[in-house]
Amino acid sequence: MSAPHFRVAEPSDAEALAAFMTRTFRETYSTDHFGICRPADVEHYIAAHFGPEIQRAELVDPALRTILAEVGGELAGYGQVRFGSESPVVPGSRPVEVARFYVDRPWHGRGVAAALMQQCLSAAGDADRIWLGVYEHNVRARAFYAKCGFVPVGRSTFRMGDDVQDDWIMAFNPT
Protein backbone atom coordinates (compact mmCIF):
# COMPACT_ATOMS: atom_id res chain seq x y z
CA MET A 1 0.00 0.00 0.00
CA SER A 2 1.29 3.44 -0.85
CA ALA A 3 1.17 6.02 1.92
CA PRO A 4 -2.03 8.01 2.26
CA HIS A 5 -2.05 11.55 0.92
CA PHE A 6 -4.14 14.16 2.74
CA ARG A 7 -5.64 17.36 1.48
CA VAL A 8 -8.40 19.79 2.35
CA ALA A 9 -11.48 19.19 0.21
CA GLU A 10 -12.49 21.89 -2.26
CA PRO A 11 -15.88 22.70 -3.80
CA SER A 12 -14.86 20.76 -6.92
CA ASP A 13 -14.78 17.62 -4.71
CA ALA A 14 -18.46 17.98 -3.73
CA GLU A 15 -19.95 15.35 -6.03
CA ALA A 16 -17.33 12.67 -5.38
CA LEU A 17 -17.43 13.42 -1.64
CA ALA A 18 -21.24 13.26 -1.54
CA ALA A 19 -21.17 9.87 -3.28
CA PHE A 20 -18.48 8.57 -0.90
CA MET A 21 -20.35 9.90 2.17
CA THR A 22 -23.58 8.31 0.99
CA ARG A 23 -21.98 4.94 0.36
CA THR A 24 -19.95 4.75 3.58
CA PHE A 25 -22.83 6.00 5.74
CA ARG A 26 -25.25 3.53 4.14
CA GLU A 27 -22.76 0.67 4.61
CA THR A 28 -22.12 1.61 8.23
CA TYR A 29 -25.69 2.12 9.34
CA SER A 30 -27.51 -0.36 7.13
CA THR A 31 -25.13 -3.29 7.47
CA ASP A 32 -23.09 -2.84 10.64
CA HIS A 33 -25.80 -1.28 12.71
CA PHE A 34 -27.00 -4.52 14.23
CA GLY A 35 -30.25 -4.37 12.29
CA ILE A 36 -31.42 -1.45 14.41
CA CYS A 37 -31.65 1.24 11.73
CA ARG A 38 -34.58 1.20 9.38
CA PRO A 39 -33.60 1.79 5.74
CA ALA A 40 -36.07 4.70 5.53
CA ASP A 41 -34.31 6.44 8.45
CA VAL A 42 -30.89 5.92 6.86
CA GLU A 43 -32.09 7.26 3.50
CA HIS A 44 -33.78 10.26 5.14
CA TYR A 45 -30.53 11.17 6.90
CA ILE A 46 -28.50 10.76 3.71
CA ALA A 47 -30.87 12.99 1.73
CA ALA A 48 -30.75 15.68 4.42
CA HIS A 49 -26.96 15.72 4.93
CA PHE A 50 -24.91 14.31 2.06
CA GLY A 51 -26.11 15.68 -1.29
CA PRO A 52 -23.66 17.44 -3.65
CA GLU A 53 -25.19 20.89 -3.04
CA ILE A 54 -25.01 20.36 0.72
CA GLN A 55 -21.36 19.39 0.38
CA ARG A 56 -20.58 22.42 -1.79
CA ALA A 57 -22.03 24.65 0.93
CA GLU A 58 -20.11 22.84 3.67
CA LEU A 59 -16.86 22.99 1.71
CA VAL A 60 -16.97 26.81 1.59
CA ASP A 61 -18.15 27.22 5.20
CA PRO A 62 -15.25 28.74 7.20
CA ALA A 63 -16.44 26.94 10.35
CA LEU A 64 -15.83 23.54 8.72
CA ARG A 65 -12.79 21.83 7.29
CA THR A 66 -13.11 18.53 5.45
CA ILE A 67 -9.91 16.53 5.07
CA LEU A 68 -9.67 13.83 2.43
CA ALA A 69 -7.47 10.75 2.71
CA GLU A 70 -6.45 9.40 -0.68
CA VAL A 71 -4.40 6.31 -1.46
CA GLY A 72 -3.14 5.90 -4.99
CA GLY A 73 -5.52 8.64 -6.13
CA GLU A 74 -8.52 6.81 -4.64
CA LEU A 75 -10.64 8.37 -1.89
CA ALA A 76 -10.09 6.19 1.18
CA GLY A 77 -11.67 8.32 3.90
CA TYR A 78 -12.56 11.75 5.16
CA GLY A 79 -12.72 13.64 8.41
CA GLN A 80 -14.59 16.85 9.05
CA VAL A 81 -13.79 19.27 11.85
CA ARG A 82 -16.23 21.93 13.01
CA PHE A 83 -14.69 24.96 14.71
CA GLY A 84 -16.47 26.54 17.68
CA SER A 85 -18.84 23.59 18.07
CA GLU A 86 -19.80 23.36 21.71
CA SER A 87 -21.12 20.42 23.65
CA PRO A 88 -22.71 20.80 27.09
CA VAL A 89 -20.49 18.01 28.43
CA VAL A 90 -17.21 19.26 26.94
CA PRO A 91 -15.88 22.38 28.64
CA GLY A 92 -13.56 24.62 26.71
CA SER A 93 -13.28 28.13 25.36
CA ARG A 94 -12.01 26.98 21.92
CA PRO A 95 -13.81 23.69 21.21
CA VAL A 96 -13.54 21.79 17.94
CA GLU A 97 -15.74 18.85 16.99
CA VAL A 98 -14.66 15.97 14.79
CA ALA A 99 -18.11 16.07 13.22
CA ARG A 100 -17.67 13.26 10.69
CA PHE A 101 -15.05 10.57 10.35
CA TYR A 102 -15.32 7.66 7.92
CA VAL A 103 -12.76 5.36 6.33
CA ASP A 104 -13.76 2.99 3.54
CA ARG A 105 -13.77 -0.68 4.55
CA PRO A 106 -10.89 -1.80 2.32
CA TRP A 107 -8.67 0.59 4.28
CA HIS A 108 -9.72 -0.50 7.79
CA GLY A 109 -6.78 -1.74 9.86
CA ARG A 110 -4.20 -0.37 7.41
CA GLY A 111 -3.20 2.85 9.17
CA VAL A 112 -5.34 5.22 7.11
CA ALA A 113 -7.73 6.04 9.97
CA ALA A 114 -4.98 6.78 12.49
CA ALA A 115 -3.17 9.05 10.05
CA LEU A 116 -6.43 10.78 9.10
CA MET A 117 -7.27 11.38 12.77
CA GLN A 118 -3.85 12.99 13.25
CA GLN A 119 -4.68 15.30 10.35
CA CYS A 120 -7.99 16.20 12.00
CA LEU A 121 -6.30 16.86 15.34
CA SER A 122 -3.71 19.06 13.62
CA ALA A 123 -6.44 20.93 11.75
CA ALA A 124 -8.05 21.76 15.11
CA GLY A 125 -5.27 24.31 15.59
CA ASP A 126 -5.37 26.00 18.98
CA ALA A 127 -8.47 24.16 20.23
CA ASP A 128 -8.44 23.56 23.96
CA ARG A 129 -10.85 20.60 23.66
CA ILE A 130 -11.64 18.33 20.73
CA TRP A 131 -14.73 16.17 20.90
CA LEU A 132 -16.90 13.80 18.88
CA GLY A 133 -20.05 11.74 19.18
CA VAL A 134 -20.10 8.01 18.48
CA TYR A 135 -22.99 5.54 18.49
CA GLU A 136 -22.96 3.62 21.77
CA HIS A 137 -23.07 0.22 20.03
CA ASN A 138 -20.25 0.99 17.59
CA VAL A 139 -17.62 -0.79 19.64
CA ARG A 140 -14.99 -0.73 16.89
CA ALA A 141 -15.22 3.05 16.49
CA ARG A 142 -15.21 3.65 20.25
CA ALA A 143 -12.06 1.52 20.60
CA PHE A 144 -10.38 3.39 17.75
CA TYR A 145 -11.19 6.79 19.26
CA ALA A 146 -9.92 5.63 22.67
CA LYS A 147 -6.68 4.48 21.03
CA CYS A 148 -6.37 8.02 19.60
CA GLY A 149 -6.64 9.51 23.10
CA PHE A 150 -10.36 10.31 23.29
CA VAL A 151 -12.12 9.50 26.56
CA PRO A 152 -15.86 9.21 27.28
CA VAL A 153 -17.19 12.33 29.00
CA GLY A 154 -20.96 12.10 28.57
CA ARG A 155 -23.86 11.14 26.38
CA SER A 156 -26.18 12.76 23.88
CA THR A 157 -28.91 11.73 21.49
CA PHE A 158 -28.56 11.46 17.73
CA ARG A 159 -31.59 11.55 15.49
CA MET A 160 -31.66 9.59 12.25
CA GLY A 161 -35.09 10.02 10.69
CA ASP A 162 -37.57 8.74 13.27
CA ASP A 163 -34.87 6.82 15.14
CA VAL A 164 -33.40 8.45 18.25
CA GLN A 165 -30.10 6.86 19.26
CA ASP A 166 -27.76 7.22 22.21
CA ASP A 167 -24.25 8.47 21.45
CA TRP A 168 -21.20 8.63 23.62
CA ILE A 169 -19.48 11.99 23.70
CA MET A 170 -15.72 11.48 23.74
CA ALA A 171 -13.18 14.25 24.25
CA PHE A 172 -9.50 14.74 23.55
CA ASN A 173 -7.36 17.17 25.52
CA PRO A 174 -4.71 18.53 23.14
CA THR A 175 -2.61 20.15 25.88
Predicted regions and their residues:
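Extreme N-terminal starter segment of soluble prokaryotic enzymes
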Residues: 2-5
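Acetyl-CoA-dependent GNAT
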Residues: 8-12, 19-108, 114-123, 173-175
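Short alpha-helical
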Residues: 12, 16, 139-140
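Glycine-centered flexibility motif
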Residues: 15-18, 82, 133, 161-162
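Generic detector of intrinsically disordered, low-complexity, polar/charged segments
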Residues: 74-76, 106, 110, 130, ...
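C-terminal "cap" of GNAT-fold acetyltransferases
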Residues: 92-99, 128-175
